[in-house]
Regions:
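Conserved short histidine dyad/triad with adjacent acidic residue
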Residues: 54, 69-85
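Short acidic-glycine-tyrosine-enriched beta hairpin
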Residues: 106-120
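A short, N-terminal "cap"/entry segment at the start of jelly-roll beta-barrel domains
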Residues: 23-67, 147
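A cytosolic small-molecule/anion-sensing beta-strand core signal
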Residues: 95-96, 111-112, 130
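Ligand-binding loop in jelly-roll beta-barrel domains
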Residues: 120-144
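Short, conserved beta-strand element in jelly-roll/cupin
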Residues: 74-76, 85-101
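Bacterial N-terminal signal peptides
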Residues: 11-21
């Protein structure tokens, strides 16, 4: 990945994390085991295995606590992010590749440098048009990803 693209990606992730955690400040996870759950402080990519997440899709969980989770998702060309809903707020940053995203009734082609905001409980999914990587940020964390 080009140095300039990587810097832009890291900057965007910081903005996304700030925005998501700030927007959900009044919706804190109640005192529960999830609230006390957290990842290691440093997650080193080459030390973290990719987990299967569907045909042609794999993910790495890159950090989390009860309030927020950062996930890197790798897609092969033609892979489908099956349409689904969840109660989490989601923001997605396109690191590389090209995707056709559907969010609610809207459909748009997105590519490196683009972002997507997905409200809770909105049907969304994607088709990978060119191999790529997405970075998803969820608030609160996706406890179902830890099982």
């Amino acid at each position: 990945m080009k140095k300039k693209t990587w810097k832009r990606c890291v900057c965007m992730i910081g903005v996304v994390l700030f925005a998501v955690t700030g927007l959900n400040a009044n919706n804190r996870v109640p005192d529960s085991p999830i609230k006390k759950t957290r990842s290691n402080t440093f997650i080193i990519e080459k030390e973290k295995a990719w987990e299967p997440a569907g045909e042609g899709v794999a993910r790495q969980i890159m950090g989390y606590d009860g309030q927020v989770m950062l996930v890197k998702v790798k897609f092969e060309k033609g892979a489908i992010g099956t349409p689904h809903t969840h109660y989490h707020t989601q923001t997605t940053y396109v690191v590389s590749g090209k995707f056709e995203f559907t969010v609610g009734d809207e459909k748009k082609i997105v590519e490196a440098g683009d972002g997507i905001y997905i409200e809770p409980d909105i049907l969304h999914g994607c088709v990978c048009l060119e191999p790529g990587i997405l970075v998803d940020c969820f608030a609160p964390m996706r406890a179902d990803f830890l099982k």
